Curated annotation (Swiss-Prot):
Protein name per its UniProtKB record: Transmembrane protein 19
Subcellular locations according to the entry: Membrane
Keyword Transmembrane on entry: yes
Family: Belongs to the TMEM19 family.
Residues annotated as transmembrane: 15-35, 49-69, 84-104, 218-238, 257-277, 313-333
Keywords on record: Membrane, Transmembrane, Transmembrane helix
Species for this entry: Pongo abelii (Sumatran orangutan)
Entry's Gene Ontology cellular component terms: membrane
Amino acid sequence: MTDLNDNICKRYIKMITNIVILSLIICISLAFWIMSMTASTYYGNLRPISPWRWLFSVVVPVLIISNGLKKKSLDHSGALGGLVVGFILTIANFSFFTSLLMFFLSSSKLTKWKGEMKKRLDSEYKEGGQRNWIQVFCNGAVPTELALLYMIENGPGEIPVDFSKQYSASWMCLSLLAALACSAGDTWASEVGPVLSKSPPRLITTWEKVPVGTNGGVTVVGLVSSLLGGTFVGIAYFLTQLIFVNDLDISAPQWPIIAFGGLAGLLGSIVDSYLGATMQYTGLDESTGMVVNSPTNEAKHIAGKPILDNNAVNLFSSVLIAVLLPTAAWGFWPRG
């Protein structure tokens, strides 16, 4: 009887807690909406954000991050960082949100996939991924900065990617997509390549065979996976455009977004591999037979210099792809 009462009490407390949290979220959303209305009235040229958009931008990232924390895809610092990134991208543009969501969900699933095998190959493997705030920052800082610039330039809302009508906003949209597709491509290649590839990876700078897990090591399976990862994010962006953008019939075709995402994923993985092969240390610990990312007395050098760590390589790759690819795409993008 005591156990039954305890269970009822726990359920009641959980229900009350959820109600309190939901009430706080609604209050926060309304407060943001009131501030946006006040700013719109005061400055005149600012478009107010609807209360539903505020509510969605607060509630949905909280639910997703809570689930990620529960499944160990994020640690507590990563969850806080993810909330900031998720909120800003969602309030700015729902196409940004769905791209981020597909990157996060697919990466989390693939990280857990064949976890026992990866644990034997990677000395730094963590169950579920457990990404911290540094990893969230290195993958999310560029998209977050671009989302803020997008809101300053265009205001919150979805627009067609059309260089002939809105060059700056379209450039920022593609730049943000490129950064997310780059991160997705690298993650898919890292998680799928070592598991499915039948042949050993080759160092991208010398094309020599290297142990699985070597920074800068590439396989055909990994490169194809990076292409698919970027394409997956591009499809999410494209489908959201079809749902939320109203004037697609008088705008440039949006289907190149899918191809752009795939290209960003593939090139991002290649850039990441090159930086990893040259500026990130890789050694083979002869006592354990595992690949390590920092010099030790037991480690035999394989490739790279200890200049950057994996997070810094991810950040630099994201920046390079986000800056260069939209500029190149401008010359080939269909005009409306």
